[in-house]
Amino acid sequence: MTYLTRILETKAREVAELKKLKPERRYREACGDLPATRDFRSAITSRDGGINLIAEVKKASPSRGVLVEDFRPLDIAARYAELGASAFSVLTDSHYFQGSPDYLKAITQQFSIPVLRKEFIIDESQIYETRLMGADAALLIVAALEPSQLRDYLQLFAELGLHALVEVHDRRELDIAIEQGSTIVGVNNRDLRDFTVDLMTSVNLKREYPEGVLSVAESGLKRRDDVLLMQDAGFDAVLIGEGLLASEELRQFSWG
């Protein structure tokens, strides 16, 4: 069983319990009168050849376990903001990443920077939940969805004022993302089947992006040269988490 399959099975059980506690109709009703979201797309759009930082607030991962023992999400986010982050990515999955919706809510209330919810979304109820949390954008993983699901979810995102970062790992998934109307596409250098990382995944796929689609490189970016590789390839932004905490080079990088 792959990492992704295991995670999605767990998520399906979580969503079933969630919908028992609060039917989707109640989520829809609660989203009827909310303040406008912040513009995630504009925040991460490259200008003058620079590259933007989506800084990830993450406590743990399935492959490496706990990354930050004394985990203080607001302190980490403040550090990222000082570094010049254009947006935050916040893990809300509790089972595999030790994340929490509470972390996301606290960060959205404390900072004016747009916030991406990093989650394994497989049901519409999670999209309404995302909006109610105060997120401005969320992740949609092509490998976790049917193409028709992706299309429907993108439409719901737009109706709720959310932006979607649509994640792909190969050319087939990129084609699906584009065909279904994605306007922000991230390439995950980590293969979610076995969690191996290859930075050339992003470089090679960037050549296939159509004009007008924003590009984000995700995972495995640990050094200044890694970011420069993505900048030279033409990416609008990179999504980095643990690398920022570990690398002085990345902390001193000139973002934007």
Curated annotation (Swiss-Prot):
PROSITE patterns: IGPS (PS00614). Its EC number is 4.1.1.48. It comes from the Bacteria. The keyword Cytoplasm does not apply. It is an enzyme of class 4 (lyase). Keywords: Amino-acid biosynthesis, Aromatic amino acid biosynthesis, Decarboxylase, Lyase, Tryptophan biosynthesis. This is Indole-3-glycerol phosphate synthase. It comes from Chlorobaculum tepidum (strain ATCC 49652 / DSM 12025 / NBRC 103806 / TLS).
